[in-house]
Amino acid sequence: MSEATFDEAALADELAAILAQLIARPSTVPPGDTRTIAAFASQRLRSAGYTTETASRAEGLDNVVATLGSGEPWIVFNVHADTVDAGNRADWRTDPFEGVREGDRVVGLGAANCKGGMATHLWLADEIARRGGPSKGRVSFTFVADEETMGPDGTRFLRDAGLVRPDILIIGAPTANRMVVTERGVLWVRITTTGRGAHAGDPDAGDNAIVRMGRVIRALEDGLGPRLAERRDGALASTMNLGLIRGGNNTNVVPAGCLAEIDRRLLPGEDVDAAFAEIAEIVERAGEPDGTVRTERLLGANGFSAPVDRGAVAAFGAAIEGRTGVAAAFAHTIGASDGRYFADDGIEIIVFGPGDDAEGHAANESVPIAALVDAARIQIEAVDTLLGLDRPSG
């Protein structure tokens, strides 16, 4: 499709307007209620000719699945509709729920993470329908809840319920329109130590659970730390972080309990089950008395890596180069996307979208309108390559 087929100024206005409409529909966590914004997306895509379904496993956490076409390949575009809270309103120069256009940017809560990406997906869905839909295969758009809390009631629910079984999954996220095709896995582990309470004036009469936790943590640092230091894959590292520790209830009491939670990030070649077993084995070897230490897995998913020279990655790469005039750049993220729920399915997963991740979760969050336009143009070209669209939009 030629550059002349789009009025770029009109496209910029359309995308900015869609984004403002999304920002004006709060979906903050807590409580993460996506019913209003999901209804908006569902109605828009149903009007465009999509078959739509709104599905939820938890009250208020609505997820939309909108599909056009049939058969294979099945491309699923996914983006989360929930946002973090706006925080202190005094830190915002505009109403965070207004979607204000300031020069060449749109400012508002979720502008970068991830309502900017959602705006481009809604436009993309409309444009695919305007061009007659896929000539082969099908495309689905999913707008999900429960991402900001890494919860199970958004993308994971859609996969578990069998509502989407993609061959290609495109996760909308603020990557500055660069592709992320390799993502680390994630494992959260909780360790609980128990002891025996006593008066602090006679600590030997008790058994200090915090001190016990200290020994367990030291065992993990000494036993796992050196191993992780040797596990690297280019710019990616295998990591462990002690992110939370909580114990005791008063300064003058020997604590009878302590809890710690650990975040492990895994290279795509590592296995989440093996990573948990490795932690549990080191904790066991710490030598604490039986029944005084418990290790449990809170959540876990493997990482993923897509081939960079074929399939969807090649289609996106060609579209990016066609739009920007330079070869596609690949990015890495320190976080985890909802793509992790499909990491073991043997499919292509790409994380891609407008905006800078550093803008997310901050006051005066914004996204460049030009980045929205680029994301929209790149994605429609990639879909055209992968599914074939019947006619250009004029």
What are these regions (language model features)?
Residues 86-101, 166, 181-192, 350:
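Acidic-glycine-rich active-site phosphate/pyrophosphate-binding loop
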Residues 1-3, 10, 56-58, 181, ...:
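Metal-dependent amide/peptide-bond hydrolase catalytic core
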Residues 2-89, 257-261, 275-278, 315, ...:
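N-terminal helical capping/dimerization or prosegment-like subdomains
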Residues 74-140:
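Active-site metal-coordination/substrate-binding segment of hydrolases
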